[in-house]
Amino acid sequence: MHVTSKPPILYFGTPVALLSTLNEDGTANLAPMSSTIFASWRCILGLQGNSKTVENLRRTGEMVINMPSVDQVSAVDRLAKTTGTFPVPEDKVARGFYYEKNKFGTARLTPVPSEIVAPPRVLECPIQLEAMLVAERPLDEGGPLEGFLTTFEMRVHRIHVEDSILMDGHADRIDPNKWRPLIFSFQQFYGLGSQAHHSRLGEIPEALYKTPDMVEMEPA
């Protein structure tokens, strides 16, 4: 039987991303999040407006979207309740957040140079996407939530993939049987189980989905 419900959060289960950006002093900030939508070589991020990630992104227009697997769950969890914003915003204080500048050290992850953007990649993450800001749009424009939550459209310019998760014989295809993303569902971490059912859409060659946006593009 269905009942009417009002859950405070609607995290039905999406992959976790670690967003690396550059602080004003050139050090790196690293923030976990899971409000992501990928369409072609574009990524839509939903971020809290008072976060250090948003501050850095607005200033530099660059980030790396690092995709951890289940193997990095402990590192991701070590970043929980940390913020690079000082002083800590009141809403985050109420939730037990504290200021931490050395995010890579706290997570025990390794920064490595990117090839196009300035923020570093996370060595341990099997997938790393160098991206640049295209557009920003506030949620609830003109309403009480304006400024609190904002969506950012990111254009992916370069993708780095650990070769162990590539499909055999295909340099440009990720094998879903090898890639095990970390999933965040209602504030808890999960991994993927085995394939639930054969997909008829999976019979379509991935190359047929290619769009002009997927051509690797160097910054102007």
Residue ranges and their predicted role:
Residues 1-220:
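Basic, polyanion-binding surface patches
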